[in-house]
Amino acid sequence: EDNTPAEDATPVETRENKVIYGSTTEISGDLGNAWWTNNATDKMIRDLINDYDTVIFDQFGQMVMNATTAASIDQVHNDDGSITFTVKINEGLTYNNGEPITAADYVAYALVAYSPVTTEAGAKISAESVVGAAAYQAGETKELAGVRLLDPYTYSIQITPEKANYYFAMTYASLAPLYLPLYGGEGLTVKDDGNGAYLDGGELTVDGVNASRYVYEGRVVAGPYMIKSLDTGALTATLEINPNYNGNFEGQKPSIQTVVIVKAEDDTMMDAFKTGEINFLSQLGEGDKINAALDLVDAGGFNYCHYTRNGYGKLMFQCDFGPTQFAAVRQAIAYLLDREEFANTFCGGYGSVVHGPYSTAQWMYQDSEEFFNDNLNTYSYDPAKAVEVLSLIHIS
């Protein structure tokens, strides 16, 4: 008989594979592709449930082809100055419900976006970039001439001469899959008889387009997550991994099973974070909140990541009437603003001043930092200079 005492089993700590994200803006529940509104939390949810664009911006703001969705993107410069992008979609992509994604789903995005019905539903979508989009949006043509469904996995999109030389013109080649039954019923399909793509077999309606914005239960999506529940009254949303997601442009797939998004109140978010009511915060830009978060890190049990914001704040002038129509007035105001002091006061030493429409996180700034520093007017705080520039004009 073995009288050796049994060793005590060491309990294994298990944690639920879930993140509770505290957002500082309220969920409105509009999931309509930013064609109507673009609430920050709604956008975050849309970004988590939608994906598979054929061209994306990477972590450094550079345009890259999404190799998960696109096999190739070719472009041809046409004699009239337009550009035609031809995009071949990878086979094997599916929605979260298992239905296959083909080029028709990508073309459907353009047909719904530029549809006169979508405009009538209150969406604001410019038709300037795609050949034939203005006529299609106005209801003058059935076909969208500049968008072609070439075969089950290939589409093309023709960009107008006026937009073809845009630095980011490649982004115009990008479409994303759109699940037509969500917008127009089961009978709606995409066809192309040679004169451009068009919708057939059903009816796209204003009510259907608007209703699509607020479908939560069973919503068919193509992103890393899918909606389990969304409650605009409670200001919460619960997302779960989409098992049919093939990965982002780098092939990365989500590993956190459940993401719960809640409203984080400014006055109590740190207490909620400390007690575990919230366990993830991001985009903290105010110095007081950053310092409070770092105090929790110092106390133990928390971690953080510092990153440079891909954006900037600004003071906008109305330049077509009133005193600010004069450049000298705008310059004088700039000289009277101590932007360094403002940035330090607001950001608590965690922010910096930029001198144009760029972010220090962007690759174009990082590649040209010396040029920016040597050539841009920094408009340093200088009341005397403000008086000087104003003295050069006469305003009556």
Could you describe each region identified by the protein language model?
Residues E1-K18:
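Short, low-complexity disordered leader/linker segments with a strong preference
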Residues R15-E26, T84-V87, G223-M226, A237, ...:
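Short, well-ordered beta-strand elements
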Residues G22-N78:
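N-terminal lobe/hinge region of extracytoplasmic solute-binding protein
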Residues Q59, T171-P254, T258, T268:
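Gly/Pro-rich hinge or "lid" segments in bacterial periplasmic/extracellular proteins
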Residues A71-S126, L150, S156, A272, ...:
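Aromatic- and charge-enriched surface segment that lines or borders ligand/interaction sites
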Residues G122-G202:
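Surface-exposed binding/hinge segments that line
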Residues K228-E240, V260-F321, E340, N344-F346, ...:
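Extracellular/periplasmic solute-recognition and catalytic clefts
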Residues V353-S396:
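Structural transition elements
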